[in-house]
A protein has these predicted regions:
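C-terminal charged capping/lid subdomain of soluble metabolic enzymes
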Residues: 3, 16-19, 299-372
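ATP/NTP phosphate-donor binding region
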Residues: 1-86, 319
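Active-site segments that bind and position negatively charged phosphate/pyrophosphate groups
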Residues: 188-309
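A short, small-residue-rich loop immediately preceding and capping a beta-strand
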Residues: 80-118
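Short glycine/serine/threonine-rich phosphate/pyrophosphate-binding segments
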Residues: 17, 40-44, 70, 95-102, ...
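Generic secondary-structure signature for well-ordered alpha-helical cores
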Residues: 25, 52-56, 81, 135, ...
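A glycine/threonine-rich phosphate-anchoring loop and its flanking beta-alpha core
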Residues: 8, 105-202
Length: 372
């Protein structure tokens, strides 16, 4: 059966918006910007300056509605400003960008993404996270293609909240371990094999540049460190996501989902507990999940390296650091066993084995911190 694989392209740098007229030249003369309020406030002066004197006109700046849900997508779809624009610029974080991606997939309109945070890879993936109107998770939307191009302004990234940048590092830390683990006992065809190989480039930049990049973000300095981490979080992990997920095929036997695994299973389970979900960020929780995956897979030497990395930048090494207790672990494992990632865990996963891995990780983390 035939299939398409559309690859993202990108521009990066403190002045990368100057490339917009050239990159978008084949798609029309008008663009509508849709994004978060703060994100558009940050990006608007840079966008207008970059387009001054060009043939491209921004016709409006529109708030995306506050969440990535079908209600907001339909609201935007009905707007004449959106209908009449030649292209759409999606500006902001993951939820704003996912809204624009899904909207443009439905109305078949060219779109470009402008991340203002380096906290996730939404800007260059063909997957959107969709929520219910009450804010709870609804489903993944599998799209036909990612953005035509992503513009990563490192000046804006450097001025973003340090805590979100920090959590982005924690989330990206999972990519290599989860993908390589999930692919282990599978018949790897061309596209997911590319994803697995590329995933192996995700961890080292985080370890090498992460701590210095956080310092630069704290000081609002656009630097090589910021650039390397932004590329890892947004581009490398995004490419891996596009290569390692195929859930939009009419024949289920051709589907696969190797994009995440047990580290995110910890997050899904932890999200059941408001004390964790409300006070701790997605990537923060996932970074503890990485340690649990390494324990489950008996990669103890690598786990020690990640204990040391997590401690060096303040990511968690124990349950207590994310407001969880040993008593919460069975519920975490039970939730984990219900998600798509569990289906692709190598071998024959059991809740009991996962419970033990989480508890053993917590114990090892306490011992590590006591000696540190």
């Amino acid at each position: 059966m035939s299939y398409n694989e559309f690859l993202p392209s990108y521009s990066i740098g403190h002045d990368c918006y100057k490339e917009i007229p050239y990159v978008t030249r084949r798609y029309g003369k008008t663009a509508v910007v849709i994004g978060g309020k703060t994100a558009m406030e940050k990006a608007k002066p840079e966008l207008l300056a970059a387009l001054k004197g060009s043939d491209l006109e921004i016709t409006d700046f529109i708030w995306y509605g506050g969440d990535s849900n079908y209600e907001n997508i339909e609201m935007l779809k009905a707007m004449p400003e959106v209908q009449n624009a030649d292209m759409v610029f999606g500006v902001g974080g993951g939820r704003a960008v996912d809204t624009v991606k899904t909207l443009c997939d439905r109305i078949d309109k060219p779109f470009f993404t402008f991340p203002t945070l380096a906290s996730n890879c939404a800007s260059c993936t063909a997957i959107s996270v969709i929520y219910n109107a009450d804010g709870t998770f609804k489903e993944y939307a599998y799209l036909k293609a990612p953005a035509l191009h992503t513009f990563i302004n490192t000046k804006i990234i450097a001025e973003s909240p340090e805590k979100l940048f920090w959590a982005g590092i924690g989330d990206a830390l999972s990519k290599e371990y989860e993908v390589v683990f999930a692919c282990r006992d599978k018949d790897m065809t061309h596209t997911p094999l590319l994803g697995r190989v590329l995933a192996e480039a995700c961890t080292e930049p985080l370890v090498s540049y992460g701590k210095k990049a956080l310092e630069d973000c704290r000081n609002n300095v656009s630097s090589k460190n910021i650039e390397q981490i932004a590329l890892d979080i947004i581009i490398t992990t995004g490419l891996v996501s596009n290569f390692t997920v195929h859930q939009n095929n009419p024949d289920p036997k051709d589907d696969y989902y190797y994009n995440s695994s047990l580290a995110h299973c910890v997050y899904y389970g932890a999200s059941l507990f408001p004390k964790c979900e409300h006070d701790h960020l997605h990537g923060e929780i996932v970074s503890f999940g990485v340690l649990c995956l390494l324990t489950y897979d008996e990669q103890f030497e690598e786990r020690q390296r990640i204990f040391e990395f997590n401690r060096s930048i303040g990511l968690p090494c124990t349950l207590g650091e994310i407001a969880l207790t040993e008593e919460d672990v069975p519920a975490i494992a039970h939730k984990a066993a219900s998600v798509v990632e569990w289906t692709y865990v190598p071998g024959e996963p059991t809740e009991e084995k996962f419970i033990k891995a989480i508890l053993d990780t917590d114990k090892a983390g306490k011992e590590f911190l006591a000696k540190a």
